[in-house]
């Protein structure tokens, strides 16, 4: 069974979300997603400062099996990207919830309540696990 940490939020598209600051979240793909993809060979991420919209694509993960779109779990601005993935994209496979993170998204600091609201619309670990068995 895939590793599904209970302290994260999830999307049905297999992204995980961790609150990393008052107005910032860190985003990655789940253990299930990296396992289904196989060996990751390239990750395309937006540049810092790019606006992303919840539910819309922000990049791609390319593996030896396929290319998969990445979807923003919340709307905001890219505040950081994991530049380590440029040289070692396989971090997504070896440590999807740690060193293999993708990017940080920052919401408007004057609207932190919107971040709280957005997080409540995401799946918790139990609900995400349920999507994998359907």
UniProtKB/Swiss-Prot annotation:
InterPro entries listed in its UniProt record: 2-oxoA_DH_lipoyl-BS (IPR003016), Biotin_lipoyl (IPR000089), GCV_H (IPR002930), GCV_H/Fam206 (IPR033753), GCV_H_sub (IPR017453), Single_hybrid_motif (IPR011053)
Textual note on the cofactor: Binds 1 lipoyl cofactor covalently.
SUPFAM superfamilies, per the entry: Single hybrid motif (SSF51230)
Domain of life assignment: Bacteria
GO-annotated cellular components: cytosol; glycine cleavage complex
In-chain residues carrying the UniProt-annotated modification N6-lipoyllysine: 65
Domain Lipoyl-binding as annotated: residue spans: 24-106
Keywords associated with the record: Acetylation, Lipoyl
Annotated Pfam families: GCV_H
Modified residues (N-acetylserine): 2
GO biological process, one term: glycine decarboxylation via glycine cleavage system
Needed co-factor(s): (R)-lipoate
NCBIfam families, sorted: gcvH (TIGR00527), PRK01202.1 (NF002270)
HAMAP family in the cross-refs: GcvH
Family membership noted in the UniProt record: Belongs to the GcvH family.
Function: The glycine cleavage system catalyzes the degradation of glycine. The H protein shuttles the methylamine group of glycine from the P protein to the T protein.
Oligomer status and interactors: The glycine cleavage system is composed of four proteins: P, T, L and H.
Record-given protein name: Glycine cleavage system H protein
Native organism: Mycobacterium tuberculosis (strain ATCC 25618 / H37Rv)
Upper taxonomic lineage: Bacteria, Bacillati, Actinomycetota, Actinomycetes, Mycobacteriales
């Amino acid at each position: 069974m895939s590793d599904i940490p209970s302290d994260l939020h999830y999307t049905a598209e297999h992204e995980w979300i961790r609150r990393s600051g008052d107005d910032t979240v860190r985003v990655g793909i789940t253990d299930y997603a990296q396992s289904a993809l196989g060996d990751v060979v390239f990750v395309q991420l937006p540049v810092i400062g790019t606006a992303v919209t919840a539910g819309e694509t922000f990049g791609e993960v390319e593996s030896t099996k396929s290319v998969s779109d990445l979807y923003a779990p919340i709307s905001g601005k890219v505040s950081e990207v994991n530049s380590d993935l440029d040289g070692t994209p396989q971090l997504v496979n070896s440590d999807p919830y740690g060193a293999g993170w993708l990017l940080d998204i920052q919401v408007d600091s004057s609207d932190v309540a919107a971040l709280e609201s957005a997080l409540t619309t995401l799946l918790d670990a139990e609900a995400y696990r349920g999507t994998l068995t359907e």
